[in-house]
Amino acid sequence: MMSSDQQFFLKWNDFQTNMVTSFRHLRDEKSFTDVTLACEGQTCKAHKMVLSACSPYFKALLEENPSKHPIIILKDVSYIHLQAILEFMYAGEVNVSQEQLPAFLKTADRLKVKGLAETPSSIKREG
């Protein structure tokens, strides 16, 4: 007689790869996008869930302003940096020229992008 409370562990081996690929595809196709980011007179569509997961700044902003499809106007953000930040959020990597790197990192820090922004725990203390 088999015990009915026996548990089985099931694992999707390429789950993370699939999720990254799927979110990138959804963004590229503009499928299910639910937020528009605007800067320098241009716009980018994105997903609230991705922005919230990758940035406490966007998470707080979206929680404070719950609307079906908000348009977030970003002052003092270059469109090229916004595109690169979204690429980083959706793919986990991005190419940025050496010339653009300092300004890009400053923008990423201002928008609190995880993996790019300095957090108190990642700041090295000199002792």
Curated annotation (Swiss-Prot):
Subcellular location(s) of the protein:
Nucleus
**Pfam families in UniProt:** BTB
Lineage from the top down? Eukaryota, Metazoa, Ecdysozoa, Arthropoda, Hexapoda
Is Nuclease given among the entry's keywords? no
Q: What does this protein do?
A: Required, together with Trl, for maintaining the repressed state of target genes including homeotic genes Scr and Ubx. May also be involved in the activation of homeotic genes. Binds to a DNA Polycomb response element (PRE) at the bithorax complex. Also binds to polytene chromosomes at several hundred sites, many of which are shared with Trl and ph-p. Required during embryonic development.
Q: What organism is recorded for this protein? A: Drosophila melanogaster (Fruit fly)
BP GO terms, sorted: dorsal/ventral pattern formation; embryonic development via the syncytial blastoderm; heterochromatin formation; larval lymph gland hemopoiesis; negative regulation of DNA-templated transcription; positive regulation of DNA-templated transcription; positive regulation of transcription by RNA polymerase II; salivary gland morphogenesis
Gene Ontology CC terms: condensed nuclear chromosome; nucleus; PcG protein complex; polytene chromosome
GO molecular function annotation: DNA binding; POZ domain binding; protein homodimerization activity
The entry's keywords? Activator, Chromatin regulator, Developmental protein, DNA-binding, Nucleus, Repressor, Transcription, Transcription regulation
Q: What is the name of this protein?
A: Longitudinals lacking protein-like
* Start and end residues of each BTB domain: 33-98
What binding partners and quaternary form does the record give?
A: The BTB domain interacts with the BTB domain of Trl in vitro. Found in a Pc-containing complex.
